[in-house]
Amino acid sequence: MSEDNSQGREYTLEADSELRFEIEQKNAKVLVTLLTGFAELFGTELVKKKKYEFGVGAKVAIFTYQGCVIHVSGQMDVCYISKETPMVQYINCHAALEQFRLEAEQRDKRGPSVLIVGPMDVGKSTLCRILLNYAVRVGRRPLYADLDVGQGAISVAGNVATILIERPASIEDGFAKTAPLVYHFGHKSPSGNSVLYNAVVSKMAEVTLQSLDANKRTKSSGIIVNTCGWVKGSGYEHLLHAARAYRARAIFVLDQERLYNDLLRDVPANVHVVLLPKSGGVVERSKGLRHESREQRIKEYFYGNARTPFYPFSFEVKFQDLRLYKIGAPPLPDSCMPIGMKAEDNKKKVVAVTATPALLHHILTLSFAESTDDDVIGTNIAGFCCVTEVDMERQSVMLLSPQPRPLPPNALLLWSELQFMDNHA
Ligand code: ATP
């Protein structure tokens, strides 16, 4: 039931407790002000007397280590104080990572690569945010890698991305997503093309581990890696692959003892596997809600948000000018492959896509690769377009794009399974 709190109310939080709230109603707005004491939102400190605004979809917890008084006004669907939080365990994990970082600093070695794993909706992205915030607050500059192609915390879903974290996440907007390294995958689950997923993860790990060496501070700070919530069968194999690719020093397992035991058995003994509880505040999302939040991220990519609106452009591209490809050809038995090639290689093959009405609403990734002879899988991407119309008579498509100009002459576009219905009037 929704709680109308338009007059506002003060909440007094004891040490080690948190105020949790959710906003589900459209156009609802909640204002939060820290009046006294110290408080943080997923690791970012609140500034006293500053008003923070949250809108629909917000599911947050304001935690305090010392105790505080917060003023909250607006319409919320859920709002309560909880004294049961795993924050002390989380800060202990941060302290352990700091030990690794100090060690790395002294020996001029790479800092820890840490994988955050667990089933869906256990707070993996939130734990990444907390650990990254704590790291920057003590002067570190870690990398944040997001391998969760189902949601896309850095880029949009269907891609694997890494950013350098230089300052704490904004309370309202999360981490600044400037200059990310993004590799195209094109599916919303690794099962869409397992071979390609592992290849993209390997490439991302190789490039980012190397990039650590370019800056002394980042080198000792290490990488925090967010992973997919698919932890059974092939999903588990993908986690093991990621742990190897990133040369993980530690794996933090949220909530699932079975996964923890499997990892203890399967990773080398020098990798620290730690089981952590999930927070009771983490909100479970239905399939529909996951779909919605994926769409919301894509919408934000094109249209921004209420605080920073963007105004995308639409332009026509003739079929003949559309250099559209897809990664992964249909499987063939090994016996039908050219000599020296395996059926697996087909899964990483770049194949041309013919324009048909089936392209409608699909997201197309604009690659920095100039031709299919380049390493398309391992080339950063420039951005995304969305097909808003396919006109078979005019032999053209309309593309929605953040860029005003038509596509660069040699633009290479990659087909993605992701779709976005542009009904932003
Ligand atoms: P996925 O399986 O999609 O990758 P996840 O395991 O990464 O999910 P999160 O995205 O971290 O889970 O958390 C799910 C939702 O719960 C988010 O909207 C987050 O803001 C919210 N959440 C996390 N921790 C808390 C908390 N302590 N109190 C209230 N809400 C929370």
Curated annotation (Swiss-Prot):
* Keyword Nucleus on entry: yes
What organism does this protein naturally occur in?
Answer: Drosophila grimshawi (Hawaiian fruit fly)
Residues that bind ATP, according to the entry? 18, 59, 121-126
Q: Name one GO biological process term.
A: mRNA 3'-end processing
Q: State a single Gene Ontology molecular function.
A: polynucleotide 5'-hydroxyl-kinase activity
Provide the alphabetized UniProt keywords. ATP-binding, mRNA processing, Nucleotide-binding, Nucleus
Function statement: Required for endonucleolytic cleavage during polyadenylation-dependent pre-mRNA 3'-end formation.
What is a single cellular component term in the Gene Ontology annotation?
mRNA cleavage factor complex
Source organism phylogeny: Eukaryota, Metazoa, Ecdysozoa, Arthropoda, Hexapoda
UniProt subcellular location: Nucleus
Q: What is this protein called?
A: Protein CLP1 homolog
Family assignment from sequence similarity: Belongs to the Clp1 family. Clp1 subfamily.
